């Protein structure tokens, strides 16, 4: 499939719905092949985000997208998952207070995102609390 829909267009179409429900848009992937497409959306709202909420969101988002998109498409909505790889600085802010596995050198260290800032975040382990620059992070994932 070839990616042709602008992700920011999808973002703008669904942002109002997610904002009203206090839900963060983590990631959007859009693909189109001939007259069919696929839209994948990853959403997050702390611990109180169940299957019923996802089902309701799917219906609301589908209606918003069907008005604009003039071809058949499938819509997949999911949550980040237990071991999601953190892909951007913005996600550190979204996942504040969550446990992560962090690789700075060659080993993973487990700890908590205590506070995310503009250029880094405070990482708390059982033994220390340190400030880490996003540019120093080799890998990070939820744990």
Curated annotation (Swiss-Prot):
Record organism: Borrelia turicatae (strain 91E135)
NCBIfam families: PRK14630.1
GO cellular component, as recorded: cytosol
Name assigned to this protein: Ribosome maturation factor RimP
Keywords per UniProt: Cytoplasm, Ribosome biogenesis
Gene3D superfamilies reported in the protein's UniProt record: RimP-like superfamily, N-terminal (3.30.300.70)
Domain of life of the source: Bacteria
Pfam families, alphabetized: RimP_N
Any GO BP annotation: ribosomal small subunit assembly
Coiled-coil regions listed in the entry: none
Chief localization: cytoplasm
Family membership: Belongs to the RimP family.
Alphabetized HAMAP family for the sequence: RimP
Described purpose of this protein according to its UniProt entry: Required for maturation of 30S ribosomal subunits.
InterPro entries: Ribosome_maturation_RimP, RimP_N, RimP_N_sf
Location of this chain's protein in the cell: Cytoplasm
